Amino acid sequence: MSKCGRKKYMRTNVRQMTMETVESQQDRSVTRSVAEHSSAHMQTGQISVPTLAQVSVAGSGTGRGSPAVTLVQLPSGQTVQVQGVIQTPHPSVIQSPQIQTVQVATIAETDDSADSEVIDSHKRREILSRRPSYRKILNELSSDVPGIPKIEEEKSEEEGTPPNIATMAVPTSIYQTSTGQYIAIAQGGTIQISNPGSDGVQGLQALTMTNSGAPPPGATIVQYAAQSADGTQQFFVPGSQVVVQDEETDLAPSHMAAATGDMPTYQIRAPTTALPQGVVMAASPGSLHSPQQLAEEATRKRELRLMKNREAAKECRRRKKEYVKCLESRVAVLEVQNKKLIEELETLKDICSPKTD
């Protein structure tokens, strides 16, 4: 046999061997897929499992790398060509998540607990309603002492608004002055003053906040509509100081309100300086300052700062002088020691010079 014949014979043998291996692998893959399909149908609960009537495997291909074609005949009589692809099975990486079961149980409240809560709320309301008011306690304590001003109780909303009051509702705080006047302060900052002869809050007159052209710093201007006979009154006002202005007529005499001490007590008197008619100023030692007082305060602070600076400079100069004196004394000591060392050096030279000769 020639060499060409041997080569052809070997090639045909190799092709047959490769085709047989491909067909065997395709048969294995088909049987595996059929088994998996049947097992899946059995797991899902299907009773009838479709079976393949005929599976014929035919290998076609001329080259070594050409894929093989598988003919699969279905029960309905159809023939399907399936191109075999050999794949190595990979283990599944998907892991089933761990599910934690949480049981939620709702506990219904019993009727006893609900009844106890209702009873507790009723008791709390009764205790709060039985408590005496702060003004009632003060009135009971100050009823025996004539010097302490009496604090009037507030009128309830059921009694209605007094007929003489047209610009505000029932006041929240009512005070009685030493001369018998009633002063009412509402939540919005409105002040009302009644005459001594009026009953309760009847005859209260409104004091409204206004703005003037150039008010002093820290002052507040209000409208004043009442006037006493003697011209001197004292009343207690919680909060900031006020400036009182006559509301009835522009020709009425003006008044000045001055606060003395830490207690907010104001004395109304005639002004000594030329002020606009009907306008008065309220001055307080702690909060209101005139421009002259502000200038004096600034001058005093400046002088105090200069005095502190002078004292600090004097102390600095004194320390510098002490340091210079200390340095001078050290220089003097070093000069004396230097002279002694020079003398000792000369004596040593004199002693050593004859020996060398």
Curated annotation (Swiss-Prot):
Disordered: where is this region?
20-43
The free-text tissue note of the record is: Expressed in the testis.
The record's induction entry says: Isoform 11 is expressed in a circadian manner in the adrenal gland with an expression peak at ZT20 (at protein level). It is induced by cAMP in an immediate-early fashion and can repress its own production via a negative autoregulatory mechanism.
Q: Which GO terms describe its cellular component?
A: cytoplasm; membrane; nucleus; transcription regulator complex
Q: Which GO terms describe its biological process?
A: circadian regulation of gene expression; circadian rhythm; glycosphingolipid metabolic process; negative regulation of DNA-templated transcription; positive regulation of transcription by RNA polymerase II; response to cAMP; rhythmic process; spermatogenesis
Family statement drawn from the similarity comment of this UniProt entry? Belongs to the bZIP family.
Does the record carry DNA-binding as a key word?
A: yes
Q: Which residues form the KID domain?
A: 101-160
Q: Which PROSITE patterns match?
A: BZIP, BZIP_BASIC, KID
**Domain spans labelled bZIP:** 299-357
What is the protein's major site of localization?
nucleus
Native organism: Mus musculus (Mouse)
Its recorded name reads cAMP-responsive element modulator
* Entries under Gene3D superfamilies matching the protein: 1.20.5.170
